[in-house]
């Protein structure tokens, strides 16, 4: 009995110590508290700032451990989306995110034993095949696309289009789809559909923008990821904007969504989706 008690005591003392010495474990612990003290869709910055600091330490101390990279990108996204409404603050956060994303893709290419230059020369399907053996490839391309897209939004969509931001978001989303179209509630289709919804169509820069593709990609996202609130909101918005004859369908999508309750693990994220759904429904009340 005594050895068992001693072992339990040892474990109770060493597990918190492990969380303190391993920056990713420390970041995960802070990330789990990200919604503490939230008011609806607005989170307090403290917990996610703690997570960001821990993940940044992980990237600095263990750069080849790619888990730290994608978790840093995820935490930066949360900070930019859910803790501030300041455009200047968002620009800084998402600029920081896209820089971390590009550095992360460099390390991903190295892990996959392919040069970054060669990776960029491959088609999305070929690039996905080149990095498929690296488990972190999917979240790295997901969050890289997100940061580039959101940085483009706050920087200015027209200016971003002329700088090739849309091309980068499209490529990363297509690589993610080639890796796993179901990943994170069909995130690749969600990102690609959102891009085709919001990106301005600028000759010689974003001539590939296709509003019908926006709807088809978002329908695919809803089909593969019905539990993701944003899939529904984004589809409804695309229908209102580009297929107004289907406005009744869009309203029905939103009405069904706002009857749902947020899950505890995603309370802030889903509260924001519901706020956006209600605003969109009010705007297109019919």
Regions found by a protein language model. Name each.
Residues 68, 140, 185-188, 231:
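TPR alpha-solenoid repeat register
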Residues 22, 26-56, 72-138, 142-178, ...:
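Short coil/linker segments at helix-helix boundaries
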Residues 17-21:
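Boundary at the C-terminal end of the N-terminal hydrophobic targeting segment
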Residues 4-16:
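Bacterial N-terminal signal peptides
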Residues 221, 230-231:
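Extended serine/threonine-enriched, polar tracts that run as long, contiguous segments within proteins
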Residues 63, 109, 135, 181-183, ...:
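Short coil turns that delineate tetratricopeptide repeat
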Residues 284-286:
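Short, solvent-exposed mixed-charge patches
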């Amino acid at each position: 009995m005594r050895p068992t008690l001693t072992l339990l005591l040892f474990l109770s003392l060493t597990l918190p110590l492990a969380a303190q010495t391993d920056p990713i474990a420390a970041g995960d612990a802070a990330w789990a508290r990200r919604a503490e003290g939230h008011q609806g869709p607005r989170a307090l910055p403290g917990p996610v700032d703690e997570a960001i600091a821990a993940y940044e330490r992980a990237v600095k101390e263990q750069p080849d451990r790619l888990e730290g990279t994608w978790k840093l990108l995820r935490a930066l996204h949360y900070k930019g989306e859910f803790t501030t409404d300041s455009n200047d603050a968002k620009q800084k956060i998402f600029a920081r995110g896209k820089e971390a994303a590009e550095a992360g893709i460099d390390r991903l290419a190295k892990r996959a034993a392919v040069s970054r230059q060669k990776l960029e020369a491959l088609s999305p399907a070929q690039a996905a095949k080149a990095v498929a053996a690296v488990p972190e490839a999917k979240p790295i391309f997901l969050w890289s696309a997100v940061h580039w897209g959101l940085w483009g939004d706050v920087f200015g969509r027209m200016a971003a289009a002329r700088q090739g931001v849309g091309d980068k978001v499209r490529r990363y989303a297509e690589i993610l789809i080639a890796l796993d179209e179901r990943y994170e509630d069909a995130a690749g289709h969600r990102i690609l559909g959102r891009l085709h919804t919001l990106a301005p169509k600028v000759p010689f820069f974003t001539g590939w923008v296709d509003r019908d593709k926006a709807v088809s990609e978002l329908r695919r996202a809803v089909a593969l990821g019905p539990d993701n609130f944003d899939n529904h909101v984004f589809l409804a918005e695309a229908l209102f904007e580009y297929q107004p004859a289907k406005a009744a369908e869009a309203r029905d999508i939103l009405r069904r969504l706002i009857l749902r309750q947020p899950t505890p693990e995603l309370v802030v994220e889903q509260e924001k989706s519901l706020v956006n759904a209600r605003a969109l429904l009010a705007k297109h009340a019919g």
